[in-house]
């Protein structure tokens, strides 16, 4: 057996998983399982920037392969197909050359939306979530156009492999400028709602969920790295919108904002539209797309229900996050695929993008006490979401270990 080719197969599989947005645990576990299927023990170390695999060949010589991980994507289609391929390789244990050919065929077979459909997804996210955050129908149209601006800029910057911080800052600034100008001209009712709706595209949903899962699985280094990425993204969003605010305030002054409290059914339709957009942006296809959208709508409805029953914002987010995480884990086992696609889309309506924006807005207006209070509230909401996800993930991790241990004893 060619140990180098086998190690390269496992490392390449881990590389593609990481590039598609997989959490660190999945990358390391997949590599371990593939090599153990061929009777080889190994050591694996993965962080968001690289994956390293080392083992001892049959002749006793050590062998190590490291792959540098560059630009990370949000390709949940590839993530699901790669997970299915790893299961197939472990079950059938084909010749290493054949397994490598399977991997190449899988990557070529991964579907992706066209550029036009990608831009449509950006429009749908802005349009849908603007209404959720209290925008009027006119604001929703503006938010859709602003979402398109974000899509155009991020798509171009991704092709140039530009720094993510600068890309996010530029997209946030260019998106917010027309909103503040339109509000100053009286062409928009609620610029805040329109901006927040469009900003949901930039909210780092995948890094947030991955950081939580990395930490609960004991991959502290990776978890901390992802947390820093999340903080930098939030800072870029705040700086970008703040720059647009400063550029327009001197001309138009402070603009007012009128929000609308929509009926829960209208909000359900809006979340449906927004989640459709996110399924496009995260490259989710087929039945999985439908299940992700159902999960997102159900999560938001439960959040509204808990709020109507008298729960405060933290408890409502906690209970909704518990449902979202449970839904993702159950769907993953029903379809025998990673829970990540379901969790990312399902939890997105709860992410505190509005809190980040209002904290920045209040600070710029000089209301520092209110800004601090809103910032602490945003941190509390993020903490409630983290606790909900971690609780469910911990329970399922314990159950998986017990089931796997029982199967090992039986064999």
Where are these regions (language model features)?
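Soluble N-terminal domains of membrane-associated systems
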Residues: 1-101, 105-107
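Short juxtamembrane and helix-loop transition motifs at transmembrane-helix boundaries
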Residues: 97-110, 124-135, 151-163, 246-259, ...
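Core alpha-helical transmembrane segments of integral membrane proteins
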Residues: 112-207, 280-282, 286, 291
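Hydrophobic alpha-helical transmembrane segments
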Residues: 116-120, 140-145, 166-170, 227, ...
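Alpha-helical membrane-inserting segments
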Residues: 128-133, 149-158, 174, 178-186, ...
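Structural signature of hydrophobic alpha-helical transmembrane segments
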Residues: 130-146, 191-204, 255-270, 308-323, ...
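Membrane-interface helix termini and inter-helical loops of multi-pass transporters
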Residues: 185-191, 248-262, 362-374
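C-terminal transmembrane helix-loop-helix hairpin of multi-pass membrane proteins
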Residues: 194-202, 210-235, 305-411
């Amino acid at each position: 057996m060619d140990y180098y080719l086998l190690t390269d197969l496992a490392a390449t599989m881990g590389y593609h998983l990481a590039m598609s947005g997989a959490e660190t645990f999945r990358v390391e576990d997949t590599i371990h399982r593939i090599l153990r299927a061929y009777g080889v023990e190994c050591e694996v170390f993965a962080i968001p920037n690289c994956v390293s695999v080392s083992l001892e060949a049959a002749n006793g010589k050590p062998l190590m392969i490291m792959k540098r991980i560059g630009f990370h994507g949000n390709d949940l289609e590839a993530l699901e197909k790669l997970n299915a391929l790893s299961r197939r390789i472990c079950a059938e244990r084909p010749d290493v050359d054949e397994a490598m050919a399977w991997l190449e065929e899988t990557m070529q077979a991964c579907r992706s939306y066209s550029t036009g459909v990608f831009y449509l997804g950006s429009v749908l996210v802005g349009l849908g979530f603007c209404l959720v955050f209290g925008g009027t129908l006119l604001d929703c149209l503006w938010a859709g156009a602003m979402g398109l601006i974000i899509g155009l800029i991020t798509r171009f910057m991704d092709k140039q492999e530009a720094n993510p911080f600068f890309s996010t800052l530029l997209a946030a600034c260019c998106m917010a400028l027309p909103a503040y100008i339109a509000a100053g001209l009286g062409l928009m009712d609620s610029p805040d709602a329109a901006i927040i709706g469009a900003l949901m595209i930039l909210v780092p949903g995948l890094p947030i969920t991955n950081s939580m899962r990395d930490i609960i699985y004991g991959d502290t280094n990776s978890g901390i790295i992802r947390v820093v990425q999340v903080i930098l993204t939030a800072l870029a969003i705040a700086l970008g919108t703040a720059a647009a605010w400063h550029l327009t305030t001197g001309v138009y002054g402070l603009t007012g904002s009128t929000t609308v409290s929509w009926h829960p059914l209208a909000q359900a339709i809006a979340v449906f539209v927004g989640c459709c957009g996110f399924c496009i942006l995260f490259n989710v296809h087929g039945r999985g797309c439908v299940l992700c959208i159902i999960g997102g709508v159900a999560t938001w409805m439960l959040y509204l229900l808990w709020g109507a029953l008298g729960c405060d914002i933290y408890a409502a987010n906690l209970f909704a996050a518990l449902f979202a995480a449970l839904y993702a884990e159950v769907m993953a086992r029903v379809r025998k695929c990673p829970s990540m696609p379901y969790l990312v889309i399902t939890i997105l309506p709860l992410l505190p993008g509005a809190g980040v924006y209002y904290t920045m807005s209040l600070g710029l207006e000089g209301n520092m006490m209110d800004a601090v209070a809103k910032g602490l509230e945003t941190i509390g909401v993020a903490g409630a979401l983290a606790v909900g996800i971690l609780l469910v993930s911990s329970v399922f991790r314990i159950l998986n270990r017990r089931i796997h241990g029982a199967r090992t004893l039986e064999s």
